[in-house]
Amino acid sequence: YAVRNRRIIVVDDSIVRGSTSKQLVQMLRNAGAAEVHLRITSPAIVWPCFLGINTDTQGQLIAATQSVEEICDYIGADSLAYLSLEGLKSCIYAEHPQYCTACFDGNYPMPKPNPLHADAFLPDYKPTWNND
């Protein structure tokens, strides 16, 4: 195997729920990788996206509920690092000052639905609350 006894750095665009990263790290471990380090080319996704991405609630987002160390433990990586929000903005804002960063910082380009749920932007959405 090309990865046996090697230190591997995996570069990915994002971690949303963590399930894909967990599978990837496990595959590399099974192939004999000595270390697996993840580097993510976006900031941590901690807020739901209501603009077409399938993340309805913060509870679905691993970075919204777990620390970097907890995520490392869950996915089995030796280390994890994200691009900072400031780093992302420095790369994009000069050309695209209206770039949406809501999933990273919670600053939505429109009023947030209440309760926070992706379906809230559908024309016939009726919010429901659990009073238990």
Predicted regions and their residues:
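PRPP-associated nucleotide enzymes
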Residues: 1-132
